[in-house]
Amino acid sequence: MPHIALQTDVPGIRGLAMFRPETAKPLYDLAQVLQRGESPLSEAERELIAAYVSHLNDCMFCMNSHAAAAKCLYGSDKNIVDDALHDMQQSAVSDKLKALLHIAGRVQVLGSAVTQQDIDAAKNLGATDKEIHDTVLIAATFCMFNRYVDGMATMTPTEQNEYAAMGERMAKGYVPPTP
């Protein structure tokens, strides 16, 4: 049950967006730029980073919804998402993406936990400064989103088919709901 009077039938951040549309717009704009804007990282990779950080934060709504978006974007390679969330090191994601996910995991713990060694390892595997930048910003942003969603105890669906529908919508872009 949400900690404040939210529409109980609107899950996660969408319920919060409907409660405060004036704060929703800049948050959705940021998500749109990070997840769908220009980046050397694919949209699928960016959604996987969001899902991975949300998984580490134990934010079930964000993890499931962004994993669903990543699956839509990965298409026939969608199993890579569950594999990476289950055991990133043994998954079929590229070594470069594993290094970037490692950095995202460091950000999730504490921003200053990212070391020059982490950055050098990613660069040695081909990561660019922009890919590293985007990874850190996505990880930091989703830590905030996770804390916002869970800190307000928003409604979290338990049925995976609800997340599949969310993932399809999110794969097309981030548009705030209207009250």
Q: Which residues does each PLM region occupy?
A:
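Hydrophobic alpha-helical segments
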Residues: 1-179
